[in-house]
Structure formats: C-alpha cells, structure tokens
Amino acid sequence: NEVKEEIEISNKIFLKELGEIPTLFAFPYGETTTEIIELIKEYKFKVAFGQHSGIINETSNMYYLPRFSLNEKYGELDRVKFATSAQGLGVYDFIPANPTIDQNPPFIGFSLLDNKKVQGLDCFIFDSKGQVKREIFKFNERVEIRLNRELSTGRSRMNCTVKDSTGVWRWFGHQFYL
C-alpha cells in the first residue's frame, strides 16, 4: 500500500543520510487510522505523534501522542507557560478508537483515572467552521460527549481541561479526521 511504500522509501533515505532509522514517527498533519498505527508498530517505531495539543501521561496512546506546536501563530508566552505547567488528564477507554472517524457526528467517550476530576471537566471541539456546540454527560469516571452537528470535512480537534484540587491544570487533546 501507499503508506507502506512511503515508510520504506523514507527509511532508506534515513539509513543512507543518517546511518540509522529513527524510532520516532510523526503523522503528517496528524492524520492517521488504526490500520496505519498498526503498520507503524510493525516497523518497530517506539512512539508516534499526531498533530494535536495535549499532555503526555501514563494513559497516553504511545502511537498517537500529542505534540505541542510552537510557531508564530501558537507561540505566545502565556500559552507556553500553560503547556509546560499542565499535567495529563489520565484518560483511558477513549472512543472512537480510530482518529479517522466513520460516523459523523462521532460518539465521543472516555474514562478518567481520577473520577474527582469529572465534575469540573470541560471539553471544547473545533473544526474548520469554528467551535462545535456539545453536551457533556458525566457518570462517575465516565464522560460522554454528544455534538449538536456533524464535523466538517478535514481535521477537528478536541481539548478537555480541568483544574485539580491543587490548582494544576489537567489537559487531554485529540484530533479527529474526516
């Protein structure tokens, strides 16, 4: 398949130019599928990065990690300070499992390691049309999110945050692709 060919060509170039094949992988524009993630594992990459913001922690998917962009659009000092002082939210059992969604709007759900964080949690979803209105349902450690409209074609991002009892911001980010 095309992705496999691209990886093999890239690996040959890395080997020729650098003398080794990197163990880190970054998905162009963060767009991937569960099938491509499995392919990345077969090629023995240790971790892979999407293109969504967030904080890495013990529950993070090691093959769809957030990466924090610093550039002219997203490089303000306050944003950098926030990102470097925040901690992961402890999300597990996230659905939809596939970053490339096949149901629109997607049913979004996840659980938190610490159910005390559920009550103050807020989530924001953005696509090319702007912020998507949503309803958030909270059940013990489980969070379910229902969108009031379909996501637009292309990349959409979700960020969930909560301030914990010590005043530290907890953050989880995810990118969807349609």
Predicted regions and their residues:
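Terminal accessory/targeting
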Residues: 70-178
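Alpha-helical scaffold elements lining the catalytic groove of polysaccharide deacetylases
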Residues: 1-18, 81-84
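Soluble non-cytosolic domains of exported or imported proteins
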Residues: 4, 30-31
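His/Asp/Glu-enriched short active-site or ligand-binding loop at hydrolase and phosphoryl-transfer sites
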Residues: 13-23, 31-76, 86
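Weak global preference for isoleucine
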Residues: 7-9, 13, 21, 36-40, ...
